[in-house]
Structures are given as structure tokens and as C-alpha cells.
Amino acid sequence: MRHFHDTIAAIATAIVPQQGSIGIVRLSGAKAVAIAQSLFEAPGKQPWESHRILYGYVRDPQTKERVDEALLLLMLAPRSYTREDVVEFHCHGGLIPVQRVLQLCVAAGARLADPGEFTLRAFLNGRLDLTQAESVAELVAAQSTTAAQIALAGLTGKLARPLQQIRQTCLSLLAEIEARLDFTDELPPLDPAAIAEQIRQLQHQVEAFLATAERGALIRTGLKVAIVGRPNVGKSSLLNAWSRSDRAIVTDLPGTTRDIVESQLVVGGIPIQVLDTAGIRETDNLVEQIGVQRSRQAALSADLILLVIDASQGWTAADQAIYDQLQLKQRRQQAPQSVLVVLNKADLLSETTEVKDIPLPIAPIPTVLLSALSQRGIEQLEDAILHLVQGQGVSAANLDFAINQRQAGLLEQVHQSLNHVLAAIDAQLPLDFWTIDLHAAARALGTLTGEEVTESVLTEIFSRFCIGK
């Protein structure tokens, strides 16, 4: 891990091929203001005070050349993101201006920041706990409004405060028990039943957190949905209708889609990656064969398969063959997935036709009737997908916060340690045995919030951040 007396610099805005309106270069550290003063020319008598914005020019101190017209934002310690002196150059957008300003900052004595180092400094300086720091990364990566709201809840302490209270209760119980070990004759005996009740209450609180883990993972990472079926059943039309775009080429010619086309959607707060695949059939065309093979691989990697059928033709032998292939490969790879049958081209049927009017010679399976051409039934498709997800006990609804995978693993350890404490109490073991697992629970909670954490854990967490955050 780097030394944190250094002054660090990074581009804090996204670097994209398209030019942005503003690009920001951020400095943090003891030399941030001095470096800024060596590079920034502020006309007139503008005061260099905290939380003031200065107008002026960035100059190369060696050549005196003007690099950019910019605004300078000063945030002096401790009233800053990192609780160090922080300076931001607000430059014109585009790659060249911000890169030149960053190079000048480094030449003046700053070093390039590591990924997540600004937030790491905020954590080390006590502005954020570890769950709040993780929430920063989750907010930046959020793919839906729901994911952003959950990340913001973590950032504002909805995770940190109750977890700290659970840890404090563990430490208080430890103090009570260890006092009896040290001063056996001077203190009244403990009430094992009362201690056990407190432990059970802690377990209930931990279980409430653990119950959010699966839903949190779903909201953060989303679902991968593969649209599969034989050629010309309307798979690409379904993708276009669902995404309200023309991502996929649509023609009457079988085999038009030769490669996988992706689209990103949000349904009920859940990010969904939709994969439109090539029509699955036997073919002599080498390029189409590759597309068909990729379709099969995409189906196996998906969380949900939409098997599209031409409702005007009904269930055909080709549809059955595709269904059988999917079932066989899933069994071989032990990767069970949800399958939803989509009866497309309802516009070619009578308006009174319902799903039950179209016989499907397979086990009962969720089925939706729709028309990609007229975009009728898309809402019912989304409802069916949400129903499948919720049927597995996972929903994005009514979720105020959610723990991530790291936090869930540590809380599982806490729950197990508390179980061991209850077992020790029930077995009437000496008090020393109670303290062993209470210490373990408190340590796991400390690792979770950052109150007891190793350098390797911090490195692992913050390496996943973007540079400049």
C-alpha cells in the first residue's frame, strides 16, 4: 500500500471517446494547494479560501504557456471528501486538456492516485466506514435507479449504524463476561438465560441483513436473458420491441442474425442484459453454424431463457428439438435455468386467442402471448419475468438497503459464532468458552465496518474502484 503523506492526483471525470463539457482533475494531500498555486493564475485579488471557486488559467510553470481556461475549487482539510486539502481543476472537456493538467500536477510533485485512493483516504481519515466506502463504488456502478437508491442508503449509514450497534452489543457482553472471570468474588453471577436471549436478538438482526444479500446481488448485477428459437420466429423483432430500438436487423430471410446482439434494460428495478441469438437450426453455412453454436453457449450462460415460438404455426418439431437440446445441456452441465415460452406473432391470430388456446406438448411452463410487431404483450412479458424471479424468493421491491457478497460472508461468520455461544451456554460450559466465539463475532463485525481490518482486505476492496474516486 502506498504512503499516505503523498499528494495524489487523478482525472475525476469519465474519459470517453465523445468530448464532455467539463473535465475535472483532482488533487488531495498536504501539497495540493501549493501545487495548484504553482499552476493556476487567478486574475485580480481572488482569495484562496476554502470552499471558494477561482477563475483563471492553468499555466505550464516552465514555459509559461497557457494550457487551459479553468475554474479552481478549493476544499481545505478537514472539510473535504478525503479530510485532506483537496483541489479540483474544472477544465474544458476532452482528453487533451485534462491530460495536460494532470501531467503538470505530477511534474509539480503529485503522484498518480491508485484506484479508489481518494475514498481509501476518506476511510482512513475517519470520514467513512468501510460499508460506506463500498457504497461509493456501488453508487458509481449502479445500473438502475433502485441500485442507486440502495447504494445511497449504504453511503448515508443505513448499514453502518446498525452494524456498529451489533458489534457494540457483542463487546458489552464480552466486558460483562470477562469481568466475571477477573473478579469472580466481587460481582454477582451472570444470568445465562438473559445472555442467551440477547444473543438470539443479535442473531435476528444479523438474519435480517443476510435476507437482503440475494436481492442485493440481483439488483447490482442483474439478469442475463437469452432470446432463443428457430429462425424467423421474431427473436430480433422482440428485442427491438422490448428495447424500443433497432438494435437487431429484421428481415424475412432465415439466418439474418449471425452473431449475438445485446441490449441493456431495467425491469422492476432489475438490470437485464438481453441477448438476441442466431436462429438455431442445422445449416451448411459456416458463418451461420458459428452463430448457432454461440446461441447455444449464450443460452447456457443465461439466467433466463426466452424460447420464442411462432404462435401462428404452433409448436413444431424444430421447437421441440431446441427445447430438448437446452434441457439436455442443462442436465449435463448441472446448470438449471428458468425457461419462459414466448408465443410471438399474436397479430396473425384472432384477437380473442389466449395462451390456453395454443397447445404446448411440454411440462407446464410459464408462457406469454405477444406481438413484437405491434408491441402488444411486452408488459405481460416483463410481469412474467418478475414473477419468475420473485417465485425464487428474490424481489427488488421494498428494499431499503442490501449487503454485498463480502459483507454477507462476514455476517455468516458472525451468525455461526453466535450459534456457538448459544451452544456453549446450553452445554453449561465455562465462561471462557463463551468469550472465544463472542470475540470471533466482534472481529468479523470489525472487519465488516473497517474497525478491525487488514491491509490486504483494504487493498482488495479499493482495487475495484475507478481511478479518481
From Swiss-Prot:
Q: Where does GTP bind?
A: 232-237, 251-257, 276-279, 344-347
Record's keyword annotation contains Cytoplasm: yes
Q: Which residues bind Mg(2+)?
A: 236, 257
- Summarize where K(+) binds, as residue positions: 232, 251, 253, 256
Q: How is the cofactor bound?
A: Binds 1 potassium ion per subunit.
- Which is one Pfam family of this protein? MnmE_helical
* Gene Ontology CC terms, in alphabetical order: cytosol
- According to the entry, every stretch annotated as the TrmE-type G domain falls at 222-390
Protein location: Cytoplasm
SUPFAM superfamilies linked: P-loop containing nucleoside triphosphate hydrolases (SSF52540)
CDD domains referenced in this protein's UniProt entry, alphabetically: trmE, TrmE_N
**Protein family per UniProt:** Belongs to the TRAFAC class TrmE-Era-EngA-EngB-Septin-like GTPase superfamily. TrmE GTPase family.
Biological function:
Exhibits a very high intrinsic GTPase hydrolysis rate. Involved in the addition of a carboxymethylaminomethyl (cmnm) group at the wobble position (U34) of certain tRNAs, forming tRNA-cmnm(5)s(2)U34.
* Protein name per the record: tRNA modification GTPase MnmE
Organism of derivation: Thermosynechococcus vestitus (strain NIES-2133 / IAM M-273 / BP-1)
Q: Show the taxonomic lineage.
A: Bacteria, Bacillati, Cyanobacteriota, Cyanophyceae, Acaryochloridales
Q: Which gene encodes it?
A: mnmE
